[in-house]
Curated annotation (Swiss-Prot):
Residues marked Part of a proton relay during catalysis (site): 46, 109
Alphabetized Gene3D superfamilies for the sequence: Aldolase class I
Catalytic site positions: 135 (proton donor/acceptor), 163 (schiff-base intermediate with substrate)
Annotated keywords: Amino-acid biosynthesis, Cytoplasm, Diaminopimelate biosynthesis, Lyase, Lysine biosynthesis, Schiff base
Protein name: 4-hydroxy-tetrahydrodipicolinate synthase
Pathway, per record: Amino-acid biosynthesis; L-lysine biosynthesis via DAP pathway; (S)-tetrahydrodipicolinate from L-aspartate: step 3/4
HAMAP family assigned to the protein according to its UniProt record, in alphabetical order: DapA
Species: Methylibium petroleiphilum (strain ATCC BAA-1232 / LMG 22953 / PM1)
Length: 293
């Protein structure tokens, strides 16, 4: 696989009011992202409501995304689970339908040790011949993948990168410095992504890109080229948006924002509920400040 670099949208999963997946809107969002410069489409991750989509829906979303993208940009398929067997099954399907790589989150709830994490990810990489991007987000999973474990996994054939969503720039710097050639470090935290990329990171798996794909692409281009002045200008313009898209748990605010922009409906599946009325003006103002309304 050619290394994926740049703005990777952590795409929402559009839904109808009855909770069914809105595939026409998914296709329209993909077309919009590609037209706006998004470098890679990431589906069925946290922002894509992976915890509440059924296994058959999970697979169908990957299939539809790959089919509709049709090779225009890479597709990163969320295939993580807290069961190694389930993650392998999802990865096999992602490979079967032509995804470019899978995103594999640290197993959540069952709190594996560092050795358990190593064995989990190594088993996936050995079982399915599709590139694996690790995903460390201890704020959601509780278990934290330590840098030593990341570097150990970076030696496993087929494991090609890490989405580092702790927001810890010191940790990210050490990983960038010590990771082997060909192992990519991506930000998974919009507010600190510019710093990670200016320091040698390879891109950003972004929530903000859902509503500002062109700006996030341009931010990634500038930061990875070392153009700190331009990168800072774009970042500062988007800073209120980065903050307010997390005023309630993701993807609640970003789905409301997309609905407000007329891009897709804002329906969510329980236990997620619509954005609080008191916060709607705040999110709307951040969209206006970013020139998106």
């Amino acid at each position: 696989m050619k290394p994926i670099v740049g703005s990777i949208v952590a795409l929402v999963t559009p839904m109808h009011e009855d909770g069914s997946v809105d595939y026409p809107s998914l296709r329209r969002l993909i077309d919009w992202h590609i037209a706006e410069g998004t470098d890679c489409i990431g589906v069925v991750g946290t922002t894509g409501e992976s915890p509440t989509v059924a296994p058959e829906e999970h697979c169908e979303i990957i299939r539809v995304a790959v089919e509709h993208v049709a090779g225009r940009v890479p597709v990163m398929a969320g295939a993580g689970a807290n069961s190694t067997r389930e993650a392998i099954e999802l990865s096999r399907y992602a490979k079967q339908v032509g995804a470019d790589c899978t995103l594999q989150v640290v197993p959540y709830y069952n709190k594996p040790t560092q050795e358990g994490q190593y064995q989990h990810f190594r088993s996936i990489a050995e079982a399915v011949d599709i590139p694996v991007v690790l995903y460390n987000v201890p704020g959601r999973t509780v278990a934290d993948m330590l840098p030593e474990t990341v570097l150990r996994l970076a030696q496993v054939p087929g494991i090609v990168g890490l989405k580092e969503a702790t927001g810890n720039i010191e940790r990210a710097c050490w990983l960038i410095k010590q990771a082997p050639k060909g192992f990519s470090i991506y930000s998974g935290d919009d507010p600190t992504a510019v710093a990670l990329m200016l320091l040698g990171g390879h891109g950003n798996v972004s929530v903000t890109a859902n509503v500002a794909p062109r700006a996030m692409h341009e931010l990634c281009v500038a930061a990875m080229a070392g153009d700190a002045k331009r990168a800072a200008k774009i970042h500062l313009a988007l800073l209120p948006l980065h903050k307010q898209l997390f005023c309630e748990p993701n993807p609640i605010p970003v789905k409301w924002a997309l609905q407000r922009m007329g891009r897709c409906g804002g329906a969510l599946r329980l236990p997620l509920t619509p954005l609080s009325a008191a916060l709607q003006p705040v999110v709307e103002q951040s969209l206006r400040d970013a020139g998106l309304l």
